Design a protein with these regions (language model features):
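Short, low-complexity S/T/E/D/G/P-rich linear segments that nucleate or cap local secondary structure
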Residues: 10-11
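Feature captures the catalytic ectodomains and active-site-proximal regions of enzymes
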Residues: 15-429
Length: 429
């Protein structure tokens, strides 16, 4: 009721002033920010990419940098996107896995702990070699298909599930373990942070988290020669021959986005984590067919979903695209550049064209959540570039939207959780 009154009040205020209701597009190319890369002639992927729509808007926008990951926190997408959506991660972050579980429709009960379960690729098993000596080769097992991964998850449940724990299939390599009564305080190593390294020093501590460690080793034994993996090897693909557990947490609770801003908001994303944040914040969540969370995602489908959300009454649409992040993790420089170009051409351009055709005032904000440098193949906590565009005003922006041009504007926001309010205020005042 409070949210309805706030939404109605906004519309009444607009009517009395004879102005149109604002529409807001927030576009998140996950992990887009990077470092200069020799392969690109010393340019970053943002500098190398042909992105005319971003650059056109940035030239008329407020431009700056923002820190989405608070000091002392791990630079994960849950932390950064929570901040962008105005929720202070220092207060509300309970780990990414519970958010993913919510998105997957899992009914978490008291005492349940959600744990991310990656299907990963470890170096081939060598007779007599300790499990600890194996090397993390790929956190995504060559971006295994959901269908193949589902068969692996079923095998895990048949052999390792019991009354207290159960595995749930997610998308591609991203899955979930629900374990009632498990410890949620242990800080796990992230598989994407240890590519090329022996896993021994990164496994859960035997004394502090021995149950998790035992489950990981048992799961690996089950998957090593699974028919799915033998078939993948025969096709020249990496096997998903192990599981890696991380980011344990209990069910989160977020304030209502609608209560906070008086806006009916929709999330468009392929990633359970982002959809989970939206659901916990009372936002509408759209599932896009063919949205994979990588370079092969349905870019056009995401644009269509955003446009449909506006047509169906959404005031704000939050479009998250995972592709640049995955390319960073996989050290795929050319694909990272391509992903930025596809986001610009197939998502931002058509949604902007729709908004311009409607006659309503609107705002557009574009920023990555965190950097995912190709060189490092993992996230960093560095500030990221942003621009805020309002159809009602023309600011002195930048000719090309990049890390360097944004930093040169000397408009740094130290707290990403204040960014959304700043964007709305900028567009409406």
């Amino acid at each position: 009721m409070q949210a309805d009154r706030l939404c109605n009040a906004r519309r009444l205020y607009a009517t009395e002033r004879m102005v149109l209701i604002m529409k807001y597009l927030v576009l998140i190319p996950d992990g887009m920010a990077d470092e200069p890369i020799a392969e690109l002639g010393g340019k970053t992927p943002m500098q190398a990419a042909d992105k005319p729509t971003m650059d056109k808007l940035a030239a008329m926008s407020r431009v700056g940098t923002v820190l989405n990951v608070p000091a002392g926190m791990v630079p994960e997408s849950d932390t950064a996107n929570m901040a962008i959506l105005s929720f202070d991660p220092k207060v509300y972050s309970k780990g990414r896995s519970p958010l993913e579980a919510v998105s997957m429709g899992i009914d978490m009960k008291p005492g349940d702990v959600a744990v991310r379960c990656n299907t990963v690729t470890l170096s081939d098993e060598i007779p007599g070699q300790p499990y600890e000596e194996r090397v993390m080769l790929d956190h995504s097992a060559d971006e295994i298909s959901t269908e193949e991964a589902d068969a692996l998850i079923k095998t895990l449940n048949e052999n390792l599930a019991d009354e207290s724990r159960h595995f749930y299939t997610g998308v591609s390599y991203r899955h979930c373990l629900i374990w009632n009564g498990a410890d949620d305080s242990y800080d796990f190593a992230r598989p994407h942070n240890i590519i090329g390294q022996k896993i021994g020093e990164y496994l859960p501590d035997k004394k502090l988290a021995g149950g998790y460690r035992k489950l990981m080793e048992e799961g690996t034994k089950l998957l090593e020669h699974h028919p799915v993996n033998e078939a993948r090897r025969a096709r020249g693909l990496k096997p998903a021959n192990a599981i890696w557990l991380w980011s344990a947490g209990k069910k989160p609770a977020l304030p209502s986005f609608r209560n906070k801003f008086g806006l009916n908001a929709t999330v468009v994303s392929a990633v359970d984590l982002i959809k989970g944040i939206g659901l916990c914040a009372g936002m509408n969540v759209v599932n896009v067919e063919g949205a994979t969370g990588n370079i092969h995602t349905n870019f056009k489908g995401k644009a269509d979903a955003a446009i449909d959300a506006f047509k169906n009454g959404s005031d704000l649409v939050y479009v998250h695209v995972e592709a640049p992040d995955e390319c960073g993790h996989r050290a795929e420089t050319e694909n990272k550049v391509l992903s930025i170009e596809l986001i610009d051409k197939k998502i931002l351009a058509p949604v902007l064209e729709y908004l311009e055709s409607c006659g309503d005032d609107f705002g557009v904000m574009v920023l990555p959540d965190h950097p995912t440098p190709v060189r490092l193949r993992t996230h960093t906590s560095a500030p990221v570039p942003y621009f805020m565009y309002s159809s009602q005003k023309k600011a002195d922006g930048v000719s090309c939207f990049t890390e360097a041009t944004a930093e040169a504007k000397n408009a740094f926001m130290p707290d990403g959780s204040k960014l959304m309010q700043s964007f709305i205020d900028y567009c409406e005042k």
